UniProtKB/Swiss-Prot annotation:
One of the primary rRNA binding proteins. Required for association of the 30S and 50S subunits to form the 70S ribosome, for tRNA binding and peptide bond formation. It has been suggested to have peptidyltransferase activity; this is somewhat controversial. Makes several contacts with the 16S rRNA in the 70S ribosome. Part of the 50S ribosomal subunit. Forms a bridge to the 30S subunit in the 70S ribosome. It comes from the Bacteria. SUPFAM superfamilies: Nucleic acid-binding proteins, Translation proteins SH3-like domain. Coiled coil: none annotated. Gene3D superfamilies: 2.30.30.30, Nucleic acid-binding proteins, Ribosomal protein L2, domain 3. This is Large ribosomal subunit protein uL2. The gene is rplB. One of its GO terms (molecular function) is structural constituent of ribosome. It comes from Alcanivorax borkumensis (strain ATCC 700651 / DSM 11573 / NCIMB 13689 / SK2). Belongs to the universal ribosomal protein uL2 family.
Amino acid sequence: MAIVKCKPTSPGRRFVVKVVNEDLHKGAPYAPLLEAKAKNGGRNNNGRITTRHKGGGHKQKYRVIDFRRNKDGIAGVVERLEYDPNRTAHIALVKYLDGERRYILAPKGLKAEDRIQSGEDAPIKLGNALPLRNIPLGSTIHNVEMKPGKGGQIARSAGTSVQLLAKDGQYVTLRLRSGEMRKVHADCKATIGEVSNSEHSLRSLGKAGAKRWRGVRPTVRGAAMNPVDHPHGGGEGRSSGGRHPVTPWGVPTKGYKTRTNKRTTKMIVRDRRK
């Protein structure tokens, strides 16, 4: 994997920094594991914007990823590593001994022809998935389930990982990249290793148009809008907005807590903010 800084042959190329991985498959993805992906421009079923700064972008197909890793006891061989436009991590196409193929999140260091396995009896090896109770303390893991059988939800983006700190009865303690420490049921599965493409954070798109190709629209300051569009809008010339910073809907935006479901914090041992 190489970091390539483009020559400034044009204003749009001047600040471009690319992450080039020669190990990625250069052909088409595996068709049976593709699904159509419709764009909604950040609108809900009423046509109203629920997520700002979305719209346009290149057409994509969704790759069906096996987050559950429930192919227990059947070994698989990594056929190839692929780029996935829907996530920051790379994915691996695995062919199992029974003939089925599945996409999984590719851990850092996984290569074509590597053998992987899942289940309670799987060895502690890069890319293998097994219950947390069977993983040694101090291990680096990713794609961690929060409920047994639900599929991995923690540490799925590029370069992320979780460390297994302690085991106590039916629960284990994990340390997340954010600094948070939380408990998870010991029957939850996790995959050995760190997620691939850790250099993703080093890339620079170089121009606004590259964001538009990815379906990201501009972020406009409230003070630059009209009064009908934002509480900070309007005024003669440049203005401060005239009040403490708020969202377009009038909710305070600097340190104001909006979380309502406090019950889910019972599994958090240490908050990421402390």
